[in-house]
Amino acid sequence: MLCDRAIAKALGEGVERFAPGARVGVPWLGGSCGQCWYCRHERENLCDAARYTGYQINGGFAEYTVADATYCFELPPRYEDLQAAPLLCAGLIGYRAYRLVESAERIGLYGFGAAAHILAQVARHRGQQIYAFT
């Protein structure tokens, strides 16, 4: 498995969203309790029981991994692996924040790491003014 992209070799019981051979994105967040305040408010990454690929869950650069289908998604064929890889970590983290301001004319980015770099490109493409604070 390279850069959080996998080819589904086998599916667990009840998994119907993917077919064997599907090219699947496996993001860093790989599981959470689903019951706490954070999980109930779409902030699973802050859950005390959150599990992460490459930390508690083998993956990232492993040859094989087991991933919870809840957190995975099929990758469109138009994206090559190198194009999709940044979107599976920094892109997902940044997009969660961007959804809160996506209709704003101007947005501020505090810090300028990988997530902000990706979001600046999205915002610029959408004609938004960007203010970065580093």
Annotate each predicted stretch with a short phrase:
Residues 28, 53-57, 67, 85-89, ...:
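Short, well-structured alpha-helical patches and their helix-loop capping segments
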Residues 5, 41, 69, 90, ...:
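ATP/adenylate-binding site constellation spanning eukaryotic-like Ser/Thr protein kinases
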Residues 1-37, 76-79:
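Glycine-rich beta-strand-centered segment in the early N-terminal region that forms part
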